[in-house]
Amino acid sequence: MKLSIKIQLSIMMFLQFFIWGAWFVTMGTFLSQNLTATGAETAMAYSTQSWGAIIAPFIIGLIADRFFNAERILGVLHLAGGGLMLMMFGAESFDDFYPYVLGYMILYMPTLALVNSVSFYQMKDAAKEFSLIRVFGTVGWIIAGTLISYYFSWDSSSSVADGMLKNTFLMAAYASFALGAFSFFLPKTPPSSSADDKVSMRQILGLDALKLFNDKNYLIFFISSILLCIPLAFYYQNANPFLTEIGLSNPTGKMAWGQVSEVIFMLLLPYFLIRLGLKKTLLIGMLAWVLRYLLFAYGNADEKTAMLIVGILLHGICYDFFFVTGQIYTDAKAGPKIKSAAQGLITLATYGIGMLIGFWSAGKIYDAYTIEGVNQWKDIWLAPAGFAFLILVLFLLVFKNEKIEVNE
């Protein structure tokens, strides 16, 4: 792959995840503090990610893979998304805000597959080349959080009170317009199939991969993945409002350290998989979720700040050791014929169904433990900690270890 193309793809990935990180992390704080949203309403807003994940396969399967170049659809979706971001910036109530965020996520979630398609089409050896491109996406997310906290200080207590967090949507809008325009100059990525080819709902939803459920061990893992997305949703939805409310300085910037941790443990993951094996690696990932929420439950922004920081830094183990390991396991079990269908199915099940249940649960728990306007954060965090521990115990008892091939 030419250096010029590598640079183009790296910029694309950077902007793709800069956009997401620019507003998604702080949305819960903005909604609760500036639009006086309830936990249930905040859950509705975050659930748009899940609805987008559920709808995305239809957009990709029925349109992107058949009629238009991927880079052109990417451009159109981001230009339209930038317009919706401007509407979110101007919204003055949750009722005004919600239709725009729903529309935006329906447009944004398909772009995650599109940037991968554009990248893979240019690569001769995706196994070696893709990670070097994808890491710029994580860098984009980190830079977005760093700018919000350390440069603009939009998430400081005074700035939040003044409504400055709405500027995150403006920043995301500008980045969306930039990526939308830039996309039309990306290398051409034609449709992967002809417009005349018949596409079934079974193919779109990855249902060909259902045969994997004949393997009891994989079925246990699949169900566990959906269930673990419930505590995962608590982090996305409640972590920033929690850290902001208790007075942790630069909360969004510090949360970006979790992505730094993610990159480090991503590089270390093959080592641990080889030394520990599949089951122990997955169990460590589950245990990390329990520990993270216990640290949040008993930490504070004073003498126990270190507990909060460790909870944030556990993100690499939480995500990589379970969810990335799960992708590797799925890839190994599926084989070449249904590999894409299997990855599509588990993505739909986790980011669609699992997270949808998770966001709803997080909203319910948040409202249940908000008494006379005061959030009982200890109780809010103990709920996902207990649930993650229950999943951990059940998984320990019923999942059998398997050997999978891992390239160091």
Where are each of the predicted segments found?
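A membrane-interface helix-boundary motif in multi-pass transporters
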Residues: 150-174, 364-388
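Central cavity-lining transmembrane alpha-helices of secondary-active solute carriers
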Residues: 44-62, 256-268
